[in-house]
Amino acid sequence: MPEQAVKQSHDIDALMMTIGAQAKAASRPLSIAGTDQKNRALLAMASAIEASKEAILAANRKDLAAAESAGLAASFVDRLTLNDARIAGIAEGIRSVAALADPVGEVIAAWDRPNGLKIERVRTPLGVIGVIYESRPNVTADAGALCLKAGNAVILRGGSDSQHSSRAIHACLVQGLRIAGLPENAIQLVPVTDRAAVGALLSGLKGTVDVIVPRGGKSLVARVQSEARVPVFAHLEGICHIYVDKSADLDMAKAIVVNAKMRRTGICGAAETLLVDASAVSSHLEPVVKALLDAGCEVRGSQPVRNVVEGLEAATEEDWRTEYLDAIISVAVVDGISGAIEHIGTYSSNHTEAVIAEDPDVVARFFNELDSAILLHNASTQFADGGEFGMGAEIGIATGKMHARGPVGVEQLTSFKYRVHGTGQTRT
């Protein structure tokens, strides 16, 4: 339905209730669809995206022109941008989801009771998932593919900034569903950009939506977490830290820190704070900071850092709490692993942290005493990604402690039920 027609009807709620009912109806046959049928749909989607590359790029150019006219930040435009390589990556991501094991029906635990009952815990789809996102058009494909593989229907509400790109990609997903004989309403894209549609989706649409997954900036995620009446898989922000210990290999530290910050500055796994062991100031601090500066990164330092490296802007209290999503990093000197743990515990968003060290005791403390969703040793924080974890595409990163945590892949989009086999037992 065209957006103008919907706006003229003044009935966003009715539209969303219809979408919710259609998703619920589609979720039933989808929940029992076989692996081969779901994979057929996924492979057809990937092929359709490749075949529609020019149409997708043309749609993306409309979004980019609007973004540039609005003067949006470079990091925002980067997340919005599609090109040949990124479209190929979207198609490959869908194929990687098709190659994953189907979690639905997997027996994840089984045991026998003394009375002879045989009990199995079995993976099942969640049902209907609502995904709310902003500028990343690839989320349309990633979310659609993952939800489908896990047997879930999905309602996609993309941002106005990516509306043309998302519609072009969504058309390819619907084509794949049609080819495989699956309900076309299994993957729906909300056809309006009115924010009232978000509020309706967060209400749960009278019980038709089981989970909400937001992908976007802090204000979006905060609104979702505040208003949602159904469970939410999300992270508020990615304030990711790297700690360089005195035992770290210097060349490794330089390479990892630069990659973690500069590979893609606008993603949630980009490092925002660098912590350097006080015992490594003379050996590691200046070379690592210089590597960042040479890579084009702005460095803001605490006073001990500025005492060693001249010309840096002073880091403020606000900097330690900031997700820059830009070529900016804050650097502090800390009192060894204890100081690093204290700093991270104070300022972390519990997303991703990395330690660069050769001392196994330091690594053990880092892993045992920090509680972020993802902890890395001698590796870039930019590996905080479902694809890099072997999950195929991810629907997001969750930092909560209920149900899903870390990359939300196909397994995390399932629940479970119990199957109990008896031979006539009755309870006394």
UniProtKB/Swiss-Prot annotation:
GO terms for molecular function: glutamate-5-semialdehyde dehydrogenase activity; NADP binding. It comes from the Bacteria. Pathway: Amino-acid biosynthesis; L-proline biosynthesis; L-glutamate 5-semialdehyde from L-glutamate: step 2/2. It catalyses: L-glutamate 5-semialdehyde + phosphate + NADP(+) = L-glutamyl 5-phosphate + NADPH + H(+). CDD domains: ALDH_F18-19_ProA-GPR. It is an enzyme of class 1 (oxidoreductase). The keyword Repeat does not apply. Gene3D superfamilies: Aldehyde Dehydrogenase, Chain A, domain 1, Aldehyde Dehydrogenase, Chain A, domain 2. Coiled coil: none annotated. GO terms for cellular component: cytoplasm. Keywords: Amino-acid biosynthesis, Cytoplasm, NADP, Oxidoreductase, Proline biosynthesis. GO terms for biological process: L-proline biosynthetic process. Disulfide bonds: none annotated. InterPro entries: Ald_DH/histidinol_DH, Ald_DH_C, Ald_DH_N, Aldehyde_DH_dom, G-glutamylP_reductase_CS, Glu-5-SA_DH, GPR_dom. It is found in: Cytoplasm. Pfam families: Aldedh. Its EC number is 1.2.1.41. Belongs to the gamma-glutamyl phosphate reductase family. Catalyzes the NADPH-dependent reduction of L-glutamate 5-phosphate into L-glutamate 5-semialdehyde and phosphate. The product spontaneously undergoes cyclization to form 1-pyrroline-5-carboxylate. This is Gamma-glutamyl phosphate reductase. It comes from Agrobacterium fabrum (strain C58 / ATCC 33970) (Agrobacterium tumefaciens (strain C58)). The gene is proA.
